[in-house]
Amino acid sequence: MSFDFIKDKNKHIHFIGIGGISMSGLAEILLYNNFSISGSDMNSSPITEKLKDKGAKIYIGHKKENVKNADLIVYTAAIASDNPEIIEAKEKNIKLMDRADFLGNLMKGYKYNIAISGTHGKTTTTSMLSHVALKANVDPTILVGGNLDIINGNVRVGESDFFITEACEYKSSFLKFFPYIGVILNIDADHLDYYKDLDDIKNAFSKFIKLIPKDGYLVAYGEDKNIQSIIKEANCNVITYGINSGDIQAHNIEYDEKACGNFDVVKDNQKLFSVKLNVPGKHNILNSLASICIGLASDMKDKDIIEGIESFFGTHRRFELKGCKNNITVIDDYAHHPTEISATLDAAKKYPHNKMFCVFQPHTYSRTLTLFDDFTKCFDNADEIILADIYAAREKDTGIINSNMLGDKLRERGLKCTNFHKFDDIKNYLIENAKDGDLILTVGAGDIYKVGEMYINL
């Protein structure tokens, strides 16, 4: 690990938006290496409290006074240019670096950077691969976009040359990285508040491919038509995977009673080994194939790959079992794109239940608007849909789109759908309507998980 880009280990580094999952991980890596760290966020959280316990100075709220001792300021893509700390930094000529630039510079200190990209499945695949790498004793540094029990959080600092991280395409952040193994899980239309269209997104992934050195590897889902159209851009070793085609394939797939897949891993029509997943759905078979390809490319032993995959029971907010109440199961999932919702509901359909309630909170106005037609078609596997208001995240409500409009379209299609403005009202509706043996599935990237927790903690 090298921090040459920071120049001086005595420098004080301030993070604007330190409570974010990636920013907090970067701060924790620096704290581990004895840097002086501060950060600000709009709200206190378990993440900010954990950083405080590790020695960071935490400010709640953004104020210009927060950056007075900073030598370098790191900020996220969600921070606006009129943020008082950004303004103060520019006035005082304090060096500014966005999160992606900072992470990219950090990656320069490692030889084997594994950057996992794709519209869907990044956190799960990064987490699954982390299990494999730890079983293989490669002592990796890990930065993941969710909480992973095996590392007791979202970051692990190792002493080897292996660095495993997610590579998000939003605002082309992943083009600032230095992958030795670059992974593309899938390509879909998303982040259309930044990209013009799907072709623009594919162009960004094409540029990502070109970042991989000649002796490095591209690991890609070969059955994704959007990936197929750009894979020829690779000037490195290429490993593809899939169910029916690819260098590495999953054959003889069977699902257990909880929709978890068992399958043979096949290369050149020869069985390498078999694995049994402990996470549900076809999409996780594909995620595991990506992890297996990376393990094979990194010369990890078959037994370590198998043990790593089979020891993975998921991450927080990815088809996470929250608990049971009166024999009613509550599961939470981070899905917020129509493709992800379809995959989650497909997995949930195989899960034992009588009636499935899907409680969905749309995430951002721009995504809800640009993918509106797809959102009207992705809930068919739910017996009943409950819609919360749109979670704004970084956006402002312009009045163009709302959850009631989505609810109206779902009802027009003959689906049972109810809209609510308040979480308390959703909870009360579930109390009245969910019966013995039913499944409540909370879905969305915002704070809809709170509904399930409210229900369980009655």
From Swiss-Prot:
Any single Pfam family the record assigns to this protein: Mur_ligase
UniProt superkingdom: Bacteria
Residue numbers binding ATP: G118, T119, H120, G121, K122, T123, T124
GO molecular function: ATP binding; UDP-N-acetylmuramate-L-alanine ligase activity
Enzyme Commission code: 6.3.2.8
GO cellular component: cytoplasm
Catalytic activity of the protein: UDP-N-acetyl-alpha-D-muramate + L-alanine + ATP = UDP-N-acetyl-alpha-D-muramoyl-L-alanine + ADP + phosphate + H(+)
GO biological processes: cell division; cell wall organization; peptidoglycan biosynthetic process; regulation of cell shape
Subcellular location: Cytoplasm
Pathway the protein contributes to: Cell wall biogenesis; peptidoglycan biosynthesis
InterPro entries named in the record: Mur-like_cat_sf (IPR036565), Mur_ligase_C (IPR004101), Mur_ligase_C_dom_sf (IPR036615), Mur_ligase_cen (IPR013221), Mur_ligase_N (IPR000713), MurCDEF_pg_biosynth (IPR050061), UDP-N-AcMur_Ala_ligase_MurC (IPR005758)
Keyword terms of this UniProt record: ATP-binding, Cell cycle, Cell division, Cell shape, Cell wall biogenesis/degradation, Cytoplasm, Ligase, Nucleotide-binding, Peptidoglycan synthesis
Family indicated by similarity: Belongs to the MurCDEF family.
Summary of the function given for this chain in its UniProt record: Cell wall formation.
HAMAP family per the UniProt record, alphabetical: MurC (MF_00046)
NCBIfam families: murC (TIGR01082)
Name assigned to this protein: UDP-N-acetylmuramate--L-alanine ligase
Gene (UniProt): murC
